[in-house]
Regions:
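A structural signal for short loop-to-beta-strand junctions that line the ligand-binding cleft
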Residues: 91-96, 114-146, 162, 173-175
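Ligand-binding pocket segment of bilobal, Venus flytrap-like solute-binding proteins
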Residues: 178, 182-185, 189-258
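Early extracytoplasmic/lumenal segment of secretory-pathway proteins
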Residues: 32-105
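N-terminal secretory signal peptides and thylakoid transit peptides that target proteins
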Residues: 1-17, 28
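A bilobed periplasmic-binding-protein/Venus flytrap-type ligand-binding module shared by bacterial periplasmic
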Residues: 145-152, 267-280, 299
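An extracytoplasmic/periplasmic, membrane-proximal ligand-sensing/linker region
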Residues: 197-199, 306-352
Length: 352
């Protein structure tokens, strides 16, 4: 069997979630390439990560500066979380990196992450972007907001996620399906703000507007640019990436829910925690602390046009151009607590 240098696909067997597959990235140069996970004390940290964009360069820099090798296995948040649970004390994972606070919160609730005492992390990561029990820490901020084609929509016509339920947007919306954690966490945040009855009313309004559902934020924006829709909900950094490659990309962003008294735009995180049974705990903590520094933050957030969690870190100039925003200060643990409620609500409202 020929194995590519880039990826080795691992079937999860009994530990898998339906149809999930993970890829073990064979990182170049200083990184292990497909070898078994190193034992404790071997100068390595093993990561299960759903964040895969641009991480190789970040981890290479960490290895050059510390001598600690990084190995990571990539896959979806829920699949990786289930794998850690199934592997129990035998898991090779030292760290779990997720792109959704809800899944980090669920991992902590399931006992998969250990509490960490770190002056550096407490100083570098604001309290609202980390678990109060220090089981996980936000590393970047991901803002989910409203995007539009300026030739067909004026920014003044847009205001909130809830207002997209207005019939004026019938046949004009492009959105992510209910199966994705981005949609689930947005709806969970709305349940926290409004309760289930009001949130279901909004979601039913979205459904009545017959949105085009596409399971890729990049593709959503490309469809918007090509005239296949007028308004979309995506994460901000997808537009940042497209503008990086094409500064004339014809889609604009507006920050949702910014009116006085409103809660602010939906902010999620990519974040990480150290697994309960980590064999290389000290190396994992060193990596977490390194990423939380202004230098680590610039590399980790800038590689994917995300906002740094550390306010002392510089913001990528493209997304700095999006202007200031006020984010929802919801306790991010609520995204995990309300995830199942959000999924049931989406199903009841026939949002697929």
């Amino acid at each position: 069997m020929k194995v590519s240098r880039r990826n080795l696909v691992v079937k999860l067997g009994a530990a898998s979630v339906a149809g999930a597959a993970l890829s073990v990235a064979a990182l170049p140069k200083a990184f292990a390439q497909g070898a078994p996970a190193a034992a404790a004390g071997a100068g390595v940290v093993n990561i299960y990560s759903s964040r895969h964009y641009g991480v190789e360069g970040v981890f290479e820099t960490f290895t050059r500066e510390t001598g600690i090798r990084v190995r990571f296995t990539s896959g979806p948040d829920a699949g990786l979380r289930e794998r850690i649970r199934a592997e129990g004390r035998h898991t090779p994972a030292d760290m779990f990196i997720a792109v959704d606070a809800g899944n980090l919160a669920l991992a902590a609730t399931q006992g998969l992450l250990q509490p960490v005492t770190s002056t550096a992390l407490s100083s570098n990561i604001p309290a609202h972007l980390r678990d109060p029990g220090n089981h996980w820490f936000g590393l970047t901020q991901r803002v989910r907001t409203i995007l539009f084609h300026p030739a067909r929509v004026q920014a003044a016509q847009l205001s909130t996620f809830e207002a997209l339920a207005d019939p004026m947007w019938r046949g004009r919306l492009v959105m992510r399906p209910a199966t994705h954690s981005y949609t689930q966490s947005l709806v969970a945040s709305m349940i926290a703000a409004h309760g289930e009855a009001r949130t279901e009313q909004v979601v039913r309004g979205w459904v009545a507007n017959n949105p085009q559902l596409i399971d890729s934020d990049t593709r959503i924006l490309e469809v918007l640019a090509a005239g296949g829709g007028d308004v979309a909900i995506t994460n901000h950094y997808y537009l940042g990436r497209l503008l990086q490659s094409n500064p004339a990309f014809p889609v604009r962003l507006m920050w949702a829910n910014q009116a006085a008294g409103d809660r602010g735009v939906h902010v999620n995180i990519s974040g990480a925690g150290i697994t309960t049974h980590a064999q290389n705990r000290d190396n994992a903590l060193r990596l977490l602390e390194w990423i939380s520094t202004p230098r680590g933050q610039e590399l980790f957030s800038g590689s994917n046009h995300e906002y740094p969690a550390n306010p002392a870190a510089p913001v990528h100039p493209i997304i700095a151009g999006f202007g200031p925003f006020r984010g929802d200060r919801l306790d991010l643990r609520e995204l995990g607590r309300l995830q199942a409620d959000a999924i049931r609500l989406l199903d009841r409202a026939a949002y697929r």
